[in-house]
Amino acid sequence: MQEIESQPRTWAQALDMAIAQRSALAVPGERVLAIGCGTSAFMARSYAALREQAGLGETDWAYAPEAPIGRRYDRVVAISRSGTTTEVLESLSSLPPRTRRVAVTAVSGKPIDDLTDDRVLLDFADETSVVQTRFPTTFLALVRAALGLPVDHLVRDAEAALPAPLPVDIRDYNHFAYLGTGWTTGLAHEAALKIREAALKIREAALKIREAAQAWSESYLGLDYRHGPVAVPGRRSLVWIFGPEPAGLAASVGKSGATMHVGALDPLAELVVAQRLAVALAAERGLDPDHPRLLTRSVVLSGMAVLPPTFAHVFANHSTVAPTAPSPGASL
């Protein structure tokens, strides 16, 4: 909880450095690709939507292993808290040499530094927890300020999010659906991931081991929720909307018996509340939300070659354009 509670401070620090980071994140007219894995991929999605919203130019996003390196980009922004994620390093090493590379990390002196031209270092937002909370939100606070979007209210809303009541009594709910629109879709996916990371448990019975999901979460585009997923929720479901409510959705959700929550705070601050809910859910079940099973701080894979950027263009010229990154809403 200490890292969650520190977010007003880390956001304020990010806002203070925004002007200095515009040359890395907010150059007008460039064609930009943002990449990452897991939480960082969701933040890449939000960054891409925000940059286009600010009118600074075409911005794509992709999961690092699926990065369309055969396409022409002026700049690639790679997000990796640890700076050691293998798939991110491999994608960076495969880019044509003319592409400017930016690393967004919480740690300096890592392999990603050798593969990039510019570094956005958020070391004050680094975390001891395996599960990310303040690093991704601090990055998006920085992005919004660097892009020239309104941010005067952000720290105030983050402060309000910490003591705010949770939207429901978690003991009465076991299904959580998070919806977003535009840049907040990345937040919805991240909120759902926090439930899955923090509140799953292994049960062992006699000679047999099985996995039991004590709570489940999903995330979707807000306007797409009625195209199938709305049939799933019931009276123990919470449907949480980040940003404005899609017209008529309340009536559709109401028919299912589910509870719908539309936050009054900035969507980024609502994510702080969602983080708190995930921690509370884990605590209710006697779990450790900081160390979910099978997860580590960084995914480092053996057998994947990371080439120095000077040789990467030889292979990039023969690359195949990857498909558009899929929505993670129905995955996992």
Region spans (language model):
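Structural signal for hydrophobic packing residues in well-ordered secondary-structure cores
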Residues: 5-15, 19, 51, 55, ...
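Internal, active-site/partner-interface "lid" segment
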Residues: 107-108, 114, 141, 145-172, ...
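Long, charge-rich low-complexity segments
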Residues: 180-186, 253-257, 318-332
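Structured C-terminal subdomain patch of bacterial secreted/periplasmic proteins
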Residues: 263-291
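Anionic-ligand anchoring segments at beta-strand to alpha-helix junctions in alpha/beta enzyme folds, i.e.
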Residues: 13, 17, 25-75, 171-234, ...
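An N-terminal, well-structured beta->alpha segment
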Residues: 1-30, 157
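Glycine-rich phosphate-binding loops that contact phosphosugars or nucleotide phosphates
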Residues: 27-156, 162-163, 236-268, 331
